[in-house]
Amino acid sequence: RQRQMCIRDRYQQYLKLEKSLSPNTLDAYLTDLDKLMSFLTLEGIDVLEVCLSDLQRFAAGLHDIGIHPRSQARILSGIKSFFRFLIMADYLEADPSELLEGPKIGLKLPEVLTVEEIDNIISSVDRSKAEGQRNRAILETLYSCGLRVSELVSLKLSDLYFDEGFIKVEGKGSKQRLVPISPRAINEIKLYFLDRNRIEVKKDYEDFVFVSQRRGKSLSRIMIFHMIKELAQNAGITKNISPHTFRHSFATHLLEGGANLRAIPVSYTHLRA
């Protein structure tokens, strides 16, 4: 058990330092690994003595308890990454996961919103509510900049360069990039700042752009997810959408407008008048 924890700690350091994973991705890798570690402990199997049949029984268990095939595939992909690390770190000479197969899953294309649907969602925001203007600013920023939700919630006041028409974003692996922001999004954020100035923002959160009206702290990804789900429902949209839908729609609309796919992360085309 102690050796397993030592190996887990080394793997965590490897993911953090060598792979430069974001905290959320790192947590997901370790949570999935812990599922395997718990299984091995219950079975009385040392992690360095695992064979393919052990991993196949673990994979079968994921199916038996009703874990979605896509989640199964993600977990097993993380397990394979762990055993590649064990080979690289000289814990093992052979990889028992090399022939491990995941569930067969079809390619599921993400939902895309039309420009009209995006406008309808933004229009469904109730400006009379305390968080109304903030939510409009969030939606405009998500769409016009094509941000990940993790990038949105961590956006700082010191990252805004409105005069130049850019914002600075810290993406996956702590990589920073400059992203163009639309005049419409800038205007919505400036209107939101009139409300934000009246919020008692807690210490250590003063530099976050989007904060909770009640708590005075930065928003969580889950809060953004629920907000978008509710607004889409209010707008009569039946598609299964999430914050990432805005990012995917942004990229799709750029392509439809003639943008180069490789240029999408750093470019912005005015899609709405």
Please tell me what each predicted stretch does.
Residues 1-4, 8-273:
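Conserved catalytic core of the tyrosine transesterase superfamily
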